[in-house]
């Protein structure tokens, strides 16, 4: 297997000669000069064992949804069934960057083209300078990864058809809905709270005026007016 954590969105030559390179040629386009992310990914993927190779690469989220050349490469990888799992990690867990990152797991010779999405962006404890993923957080991700089951607000197995419907865009919120419904307070409760507040303000105002009146009658300054 291959594990990679390359420099994010680094520059590279993207020289047209690379289109003849077997690492890149099957995917129709080269990674853009300003973002070598897919060049690293394809380099690692090329070196996987043909029968059962597995690779995990850490990259910025942009690789999941950016268009143009990167969109073409992503589509080719998805058509091939190469992308097995996409895991969204919390922001600020690495020393060298605070941006949220994603782990993409690729496999050679898969028999299907579905993609398992895990949104682990909230799986961390707050540390002094950065966020920390504990063994418990990592275990939760691994359990989900092994099961490939639907987990509310955490994981979703997207069929290839669903990915095509989303134009090969792998942005995690398209597949894992983490929206928390805010509890809606009944209007009658809101009105009664407002009434109570108004009454409290009225009574406080009355008390204040009364105190001012007492002051007015007792201070020497008031008498001198």
Model-derived features with residue positions:
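A conserved structural/catalytic subdomain of Rossmann-like adenosyl-cofactor enzymes
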Residues: 1-225
């Amino acid at each position: 297997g291959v594990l990679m954590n390359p420099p994010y969105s680094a520059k590279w030559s993207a020289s047209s000669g690379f289109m003849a390179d077997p690492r890149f040629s099957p995917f129709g386009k080269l990674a853009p000069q300003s973002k070598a992310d897919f060049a690293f990914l394809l380099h690692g993927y090329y070196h996987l064992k043909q029968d059962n190779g597995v690779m995990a690469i850490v990259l910025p989220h942009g690789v999941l949804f950016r268009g143009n050349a990167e969109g073409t490469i992503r589509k080719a990888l998805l058509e091939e069934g190469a992308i097995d799992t996409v895991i969204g990690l919390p922001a600020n867990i690495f020393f060298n960057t605070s941006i949220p990152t994603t782990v993409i797991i690729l496999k050679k010779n898969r028999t299907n083209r579905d993609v398992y999405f895990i949104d682990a962006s909230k799986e961390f404890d707050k540390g002094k300078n950065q966020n920390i993923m504990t063994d418990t957080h990592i275990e939760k991700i691994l359990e989900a990864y092994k099961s490939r089951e639907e987990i509310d607000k955490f994981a979703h197995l997207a069929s290839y058809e669903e990915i095509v419907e989303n134009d090969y865009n792998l942005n995690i919120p398209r597949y894992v809905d983490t929206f928390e419904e805010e509890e809606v307070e009944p209007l009658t409760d809101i009105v009664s709270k407002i009434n109570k507040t108004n009454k409290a303000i009225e009574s406080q105002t009355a008390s204040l005026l009364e105190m001012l009146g007492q002051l007015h009658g007792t201070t020497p300054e008031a008498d001198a007016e």
